[in-house]
């Protein structure tokens, strides 16, 4: 992944998820690097619903591809505001538009400083350079 595939308007995790401030909440999805590693997405299973509480690192679902099955983890703590209803019927959206249309969950953050503790775009871009062995 080239560094231009790293959006500057969000934070990142070492697990290749992104967290983007959105109307007072935080939307969560996976990065282009993660999509590239997974291949064609066949199923997105979100195990949470609006009102559920999440803590950092708690699994909130799985993503399945032709290659593998991966867990999805909450990058911040908070209450689930909603899940992306499109992904249940259109998992391929993740391949097509992982940064916008294929957001997975939206969280009402319980601690705004957790978002600041995630990787900024420049740090994440550096991480990607070392991911290419």
Identify the function of each model-found stretch.
Residues 25, 77-79:
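Structural motif
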Residues 1-59, 96-97, 101-133:
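Acidic, low-complexity mobile loops and tails
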Residues 81-105:
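Aromatic- and Lys/Arg-enriched surface recognition patch
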Residues 11, 53, 64, 70-74:
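Small beta-strand-rich domains/subdomains or short beta-sheet motifs embedded
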Residues 59-61, 66-68, 86-87, 111:
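Short, charged beta-turn/beta-strand-edge "cap" motif at the junction between a beta-strand
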Residues 19-21, 46, 66, 83-86:
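Residue-level recognition of beta-strand microenvironments
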Residues 21, 65-66, 75, 110:
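A short, compositionally biased micro-patch
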